[in-house]
Amino acid sequence: MIKLDILSDPICPWCHIGKTNLFRALQKHPDHPFVLEWHPFQLNPDMPEGGRDRRAYLEEKFGGKEGAVRAYAPVVEAAEAAGLTIDFEVIKVTPNTLDAHRLIHWAGLEEKQTHVVQALFEAYFEQGRDIGDIPTLIDIGVGCGMEREMLDRLFASDADREDIRARDAHARERGVSGVPTFVIANQHVLRGAQPPELWGQVIEEILEELNKQAGSDATAT
């Protein structure tokens, strides 16, 4: 199997689109060799813990309402092409995602990581839920099969806060400046929301190489 490390943030629309495109390719190639692991990268690491009003934040970031609309036009187009429903009007808060990344980390310990990542994307982009809010995160985790009592206990503590920050910082030190970023076998990097056709080509090339290696090994024995 081949490790596919994915650096992502659950409030990043390109990450949602990138995941959707990747999984469309994986569904077409059920024999794909990938084992997925999700890693933290905060788009807004300095966001206050309670988040900020999304409209005010975006208008400040992009120089007014028209600038924000222009900046998000390619996102809307790409989301439609991916078959996604993203309701930006329903999103009221831009949250700090540190606690969401803690949840993703804990989900990985139970092999529920991708399920939780998808649930976070849907909660934020389709339902407008505040995924910086701990009760909301606990509900999402429970909906993915995690234990409520365990999540209550973990979120009441500082468990893994510094670990998430350190992993985010390590990614930046390695040159990651945006997400999604996909790292194949700790060697090859793909940046951005790549189309499913490209992922299909990558999968086929890897499978071909693995088959060649298997043939060489069989010949050698």
Task: State each model region's role.
Residues P48-G50, T94-L98, R129-I134:
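Short acidic alpha-helix initiation/capping motifs at coil-to-helix transition points
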Residues E59, G83-E89, A100-R102, F121-F125:
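Short, flexible active-site loops
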Residues E66-D99:
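Ordered, amphipathic secondary-structure segments that act as subunit-interaction surfaces
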